């Protein structure tokens, strides 16, 4: 009894507190409604309070701003008060009956006040005991853990100490993450917290907030969020459910005024714009035609139970944007601009009687439409109206006739085009009522018709049919002939119900098929019925453009409890699959015959006629222009078009008078006589005839001045209107040959023509446009000789680079030569036909010898999802991932190219290896400290090697490698120059002979005798012999070699050594007769041999635009060695295979030979298929495979369980083949071999195999 009495006291005190809160909130709401416009920009807290009769007492969502950071961070949180004690039971039942929706009870914890009476805490010692003793219970630890994990979602968590600070209420529930509103009326005022911040970051981009400091920001008034799902609350020992029809909710809904985003106050409109909604990236459709499968709930990914598989109604993302109803100004704005193109002032449709009643929005009926629907184009067909008409819900037609006034001359009959048959639409004319529908209908619109139908009805009056063959108008109210407007285009059906059994058109850009991965059929049906039940009562979240919604008026309202029970019942009854539908944009199909003149832009004609000539003459058959005074509501653009028509009419009359006089241009008059009187537009033949004239007017002295003026204006106008005319003819699918006489292709270079393939502009066409003006190159910039220092790859030595493409793998300086412009006139966007024979090199960029092909018989048996075009005799250039082993050998081998390729950027590369220099004609090399270098000139670029010491013998090794690109225009002329630098000795050794007297034996008697003695003496050098042999720039000898076709044929795919003679061309004659002259004045000797140069050459021709060549032959040797290593990899054994040519799991015998993995029959060992490992991108084991990497058609969890020792090969085209060896040892061995093959795939180029097979190649 004590516990019950204490509980009743607590309930009474709680009720008293709630009444005070209710009174304060109502007063505060009234003040906020009056200051709504002033606080729309700077409000820092927007509390929204909801009062329920039972269960949860009050709720509020609060926002606070922290100005300590830059920029200030916004924090949003909520506090919930509840008097029930069965929170754990509520959370358990919500997990079972919430149908997949996020339940707020998962994140709720009940906190107890430490000051509560001990008798009241006796029965609840299991929960409150630890809190009273200062021990944090496990529930609160879990709550803190949840708060830490969900910090990235933008929702703070509350600790146990913060909750203990409340004190006043006995039971307080804090929501870790606020959810959507409980009932339909709370949807608009609640915005769920969504953030993409990382863990431990505050919501909305703010700073981190501690758990103890967070509760200090909570407001004094507690509040609760309204969950979207059904909530059970235990209050005073009895189970009750909040009702949507609660009097408190309706009263708070009616009395509250919420400012919308346009700054207008609407009573009862609680639709807020969803800023997180984005257009569908997968389908490319507009916002108003999004379906449920295109969105995924943010909260559904956080759930770990069975409720994750169920989709929430909020996942449909039905727009809650506040929209204004259609007004008179909207009708004027949408009708007048659209009708201006018809040159006839439109007649405003009469307003529907119920239109003024719909201007005032009521709380019970508030259809919220998407922004895209209100801004749609005029005459856009409403899918919901068509659906209601097909279901028989909108059988009544909306017809309104304008009331006849005294001064009115036109009568308009308005009817939606979707409710008419073809014969009825053909009989409708502007200004003439229908014969059977002249009686006005007092019932303006069916109740089941959406409000968007009024917009469609009001704007479709300007697009009724206008036939050129129709007779004069039957209107008796006016004597003028009214021009009829063309037919409204036919729309494509929104749903393709015949898919996949009907015609499968191309919808790759704007459609998507919803499969089981995006939306399960069972959930699809449950969401369908749940929405149908929720839309039966008036809800502000109703969307007229939703494909699942069906507006039902006149039926009784149902509560959210009944809706959830109904969805559960339908979900349990119907478990069958549905046929997927294609949701896409609707296409408009135009009638080319009727819209030919309507889409053609009017050709403007001008003349020097006076104002009197603008008035139509009384010629029989001349069209009568409408009076401007009778069209006061016409737009300014329409008036201008009417004046232009009057000028055209006056021009026609003037030409007829000139034709009768016999002094006019016959070509122009014949074109002017073809004017269409009914449509008041010139026929298409006029454009083709006028376009044959010269672009500039020609002055003729013997012609009439008026005709010359006419032709001048016509020719000038044609230049300005040629683009518009070509675009119009392009849209109709008919091209005029006289207009497209220059470029001969469609307007947009990158577009695809709807009516056939058009050739692109080639070099001949562009040359014709340039009027034979060729590009001239300045001789000063043709050859640039710049000196730079680079380093070799193998030695740290200096190389002087002048003009060469590359040396030792390093790019050199390029010059502004004519070869730089050899591709100047290539098309900007290459087409498939521009490169003949290279279609197979798009994906892997590999040559023909290494691309296996798929057999047509294998494709028919395998039943693969992708289809390839069948060829009569496939070559290896058209191969896929695997081929049949039964193919003929001639298919496997590539065909030799017999004709010369003309679509390549060059003809390949020629490699030079300077082996060394032999037998130099230089003496005394050691005393001169000589060094030499090689200068290599290919005619465009020059490169010089580093300086190397010249040995005493006169022979040295160089080992220098160079590459030259062989262009298509001409073959290079090679010039190799040997340069030397030395130090002239200051003194020289001279041998002299001296006479040394001998002693006489005869004491001075006789003749004295002498002997000659040779001696070496050092003396100053008079001249140095090297000064007369070496030029001042160091040039000593050179050789010239012309590269011809015969030489390239001898070194094709093989290396061959040559010995070139070096000729001395700079040595001067220093004989005695020229001894007195200076060195530079001496004559030069004839060229004579001074040494020999040993060169190795190799030529690699180009066979593909995507072929890559190595920089040097040394790199080419390493590539060939890697290719040989890959070719030598071999292995065989049994494995299980799934994918490729078999869709089921099969055990086969596999043999690996290089890049070919051949599958044999398990018993007979007969070859079944060959898998091309060149197309493999990666190999992954079971530890590396995740569910995202596997395709939708393959199994995920089952493969990992049953085939735990498997590995998967992923190909370039997205195909996957799974293999499972018998043992783990074999699996590791297969993985090692296959990964080695995949790594060596990068060394595959078309030249590698031919370079390897060359018998004379030295590796």
UniProtKB/Swiss-Prot annotation:
**Could you tell me one molecular function GO term of this UniProt entry?**
GTP binding
| SUPFAM superfamilies membership | PH domain-like (SSF50729)
The answer to whether UniProt assigns keyword Phosphoprotein to this entry is no
The intrachain disulfides are none
**Residue numbers spanned by region Disordered:** 185-416, 428-455, 862-902
Q: Where is the composition biased (Basic and acidic residues)?
A: 247-267, 305-324, 368-391
Q: Which residues fall in a compositionally biased region of kind Polar residues? A: 277-289
Residue ranges, compositional bias (Low complexity): 397-411
Q: Which keywords, in A-to-Z order, does the entry hold? A: Cell cycle, Cell division
PH domain ranges (all copies): 1128-1239
- Matches recorded under Pfam families: PH (PF00169)
Q: Which domain of life is it from?
A: Eukaryota
Set out the biological process GO terms recorded for this chain's protein: axial cellular bud site selection; protein localization to bud neck
Q: Which GO terms describe its cellular component?
A: cell septum; cellular bud neck contractile ring
Q: Where in the cell is it found?
A: Cell septum
Which protein family is named in the record? Belongs to the BUD4 family.
This molecule's function is given as: May be involved in the septin organization at the site of septation.
What is the protein name stated in its UniProt record? Bud site selection protein 4 homolog
**Organism in which the protein naturally occurs:** Eremothecium gossypii (strain ATCC 10895 / CBS 109.51 / FGSC 9923 / NRRL Y-1056) (Yeast)
């Amino acid at each position: 009894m004590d516990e019950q009495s204490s509980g009743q006291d607590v309930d009474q005190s709680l009720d008293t507190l709630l009444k005070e809160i209710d009174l304060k909130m109502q007063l505060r709401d009234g003040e906020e409604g009056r200051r709504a416009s002033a606080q729309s920009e700077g409000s820092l807290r927007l509390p929204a309070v909801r009062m329920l009769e039972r269960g949860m007492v009050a709720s509020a969502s609060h926002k606070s701003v922290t100005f300590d950071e830059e920029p200030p961070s916004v924090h949003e949180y909520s506090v919930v008060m509840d008097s029930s004690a069965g929170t754990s039971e509520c959370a358990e039942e919500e997990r079972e009956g919430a149908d997949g929706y996020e339940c707020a009870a998962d994140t709720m914890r009940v906190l107890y006040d430490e000051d509560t009476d001990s008798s009241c805490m006796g029965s609840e010692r299991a929960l409150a005991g630890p809190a009273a003793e200062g021990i944090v219970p496990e529930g609160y630890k879990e709550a803190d853990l949840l708060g830490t994990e969900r910090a990235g979602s933008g929702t703070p968590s509350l600790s146990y100490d913060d909750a203990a600070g409340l004190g006043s209420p006995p039971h307080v529930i804090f929501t870790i993450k606020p959810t959507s509103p409980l009932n339909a009326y709370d949807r608009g005022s609640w915005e769920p917290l969504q953030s993409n911040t990382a863990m431990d970051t505050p919501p909305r981009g703010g700073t981190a907030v501690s758990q103890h400091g967070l509760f200090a920001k909570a407001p004094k008034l507690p509040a609760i969020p309204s969950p979207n799902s059904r909530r059970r609350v235990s209050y005073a020992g009895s189970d009750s459910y909040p009702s949507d029809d609660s009097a408190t909710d309706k009263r708070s809904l009616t009395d509250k005024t919420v400012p919308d985003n346009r700054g207008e106050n609407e009573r009862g409109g609680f639709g807020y714009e969803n800023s997180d909604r984005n257009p569908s990236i997968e389908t490319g459709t507009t916002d108003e035609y999004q379906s449920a499968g295109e969105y995924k709930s943010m909260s559904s990914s956080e759930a770990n139970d069975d409720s994750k598989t169920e989709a929430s109604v909020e996942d449909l993302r039905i727009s809650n944007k506040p929209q204004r109803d259609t007004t008179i100004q909207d009708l004027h704005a949408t009708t007048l601009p659209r009708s201006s193109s018809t040159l006839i002032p439109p007649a405003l449709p009469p307003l529907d009687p119920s239109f003024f009643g719909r201007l005032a929005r009521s709380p019970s009926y508030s259809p919220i439409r998407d922004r895209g629907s209100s801004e749609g184009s005029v005459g856009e067909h409403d899918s919901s109206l068509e659906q209601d008409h097909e279901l028989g819900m909108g059988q009544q037609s909306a017809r309104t006739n304008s009331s006849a006034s005294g001064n009115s001359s036109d009568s308009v009959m308005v009817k939606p085009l979707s409710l008419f048959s073809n014969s009825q639409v053909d009989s409708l004319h502007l200004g003439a009522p229908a014969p059977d529908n002249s009686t006005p209908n007092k019932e303006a619109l069916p109740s089941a018709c959406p409000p968007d139908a009024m917009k469609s009805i009001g704007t479709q009056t300007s697009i009724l049919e206008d036939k050129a063959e129709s007779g004069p108008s039957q209107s008796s109210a006016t004597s003028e002939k009214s021009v009829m407007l063309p037919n409204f285009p036919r729309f494509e059906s929104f749903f393709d119900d015949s898919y996949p059994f009907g015609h499968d058109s191309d919808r790759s850009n704007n459609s998507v098929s919803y499969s089981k991965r995006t939306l399960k059929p069972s959930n699809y049906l449950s969401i369908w019925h749940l929405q149908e039940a929720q839309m039966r009562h008036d809800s502000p979240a109703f969307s007229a453009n939703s494909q699942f919604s069906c507006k039902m008026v006149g039926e009784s309202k149902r509560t959210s409890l009944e809706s959830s029970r109904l969805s559960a019942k339908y979900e349990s009854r119907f478990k069958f699959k549905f046929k997927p539908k294609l949701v896409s944009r609707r296409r408009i199909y135009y009638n080319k015959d009727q819209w030919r003149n309507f889409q053609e832009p009017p050709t403007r004609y001008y003349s020097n006629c006076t104002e009197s000539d603008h008035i139509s003459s009384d010629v029989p058959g001349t069209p009568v222009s409408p009076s401007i005074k009778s069209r006061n509501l016409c737009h300014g653009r329409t008036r201008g078009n009417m004046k232009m028509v009057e000028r055209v009419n006056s021009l026609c009359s003037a030409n007829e008078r000139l034709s009768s006089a016999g002094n006019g241009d016959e070509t122009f008059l014949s074109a002017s006589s073809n004017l269409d009187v009914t449509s008041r537009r010139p026929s298409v033949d006029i454009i083709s005839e006028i376009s044959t004239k010269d672009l500039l007017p020609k002055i003729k002295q013997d012609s009439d001045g008026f005709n010359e003026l006419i032709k001048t204006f016509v020719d000038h106008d044609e230049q300005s209107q040629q683009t518009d005319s070509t675009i119009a003819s392009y849209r109709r699918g008919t091209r005029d040959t006289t207009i497209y006489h220059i470029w001969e292709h469609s307007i947009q270079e990158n577009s695809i023509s709807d009516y056939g393939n058009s050739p692109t502009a080639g070099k001949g066409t562009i040359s014709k446009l340039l009027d034979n003006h060729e590009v001239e190159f300045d001789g000063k910039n043709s050859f640039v000789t710049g000196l730079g220092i680079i380093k070799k790859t193998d030695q740290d030595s200096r190389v002087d680079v002048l003009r060469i493409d590359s040396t030792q793998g390093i790019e050199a300086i390029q010059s502004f030569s004519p070869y730089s412009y050899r591709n100047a006139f290539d098309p900007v966007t290459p087409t498939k036909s521009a490169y003949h024979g290279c279609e197979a090199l798009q994906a892997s960029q590999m040559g023909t010898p290494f691309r296996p092909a798929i057999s047509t018989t294998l494709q028919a048996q395998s039943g693969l999802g992708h289809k390839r075009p069948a060829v009569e005799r496939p070559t290896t250039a058209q191969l896929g991932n695997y081929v049949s082993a039964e193919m003929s050998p001639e298919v496997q081998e590539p065909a030799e190219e017999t004709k010369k390729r003309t679509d390549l950027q060059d003809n390949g590369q020629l490699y030079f290896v300077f082996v060394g220099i032999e037998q130099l004609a230089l003496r005394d090399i050691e005393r001169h400290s000589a060094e030499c270098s090689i200068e290599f000139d290919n005619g465009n670029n020059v490169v010089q090697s580093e300086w190397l010491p010249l040995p005493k013998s006169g022979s040295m090794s160089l080992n220098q490698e160079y590459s030259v690109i062989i262009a298509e225009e001409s073959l290079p002329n090679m010039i190799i120059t040997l340069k030397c630098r030395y130090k002239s000795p200051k003194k020289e050794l001279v041998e002299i002979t001296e006479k040394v007297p001998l002693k006489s034996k005869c004491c001075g008697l006789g003749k004295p005798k002498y002997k000659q003695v040779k001696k070496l003496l050092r003396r100053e050098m008079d001249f140095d012999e090297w000064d007369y042999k070496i030029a001042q720039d160091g040039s000593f000898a050179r050789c010239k070699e012309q590269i011809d076709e015969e030489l390239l044929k001898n070194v094709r795919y093989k290396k061959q050594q040559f010995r070139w003679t070096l000729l001395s061309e700079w040595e001067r004659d220093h004989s005695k007769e020229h001894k007195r002259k200076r060195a530079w004045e001496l004559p030069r000797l004839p060229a004579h041999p001074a040494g020999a140069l040993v060169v190795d050459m190799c030529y690699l021709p180009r066979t593909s635009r995507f072929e890559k060549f190595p920089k040097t032959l040394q790199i080419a040797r390493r590539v060939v060695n890697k290719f040989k290593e890959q070719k030598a990899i071999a292995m065989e054994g049994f494995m299980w295979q799934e994918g490729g040519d078999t869709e089921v799991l099969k055990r086969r015998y596999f043999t690996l030979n290089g890049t070919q993995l051949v599958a044999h029959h398990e018993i007979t060992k007969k070859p079944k298929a060959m898998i091309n490992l060149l197309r493999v991108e990666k190999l992954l084991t079971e530890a590396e495979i995740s569910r995202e990497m596997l395709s939708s058609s393959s199994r995920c969890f089952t493969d990992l369980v049953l085939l735990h020792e498997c590995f998967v090969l992923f190909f370039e085209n997205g195909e996957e083949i799974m293999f499972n060896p018998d043992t783990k040892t074999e699996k590791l061995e297969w993985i090692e071999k296959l990964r080695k093959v995949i790594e060596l795939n990068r060394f595959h180029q078309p030249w590698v195999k031919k370079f390897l097979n060359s018998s004379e190649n030295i590796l």
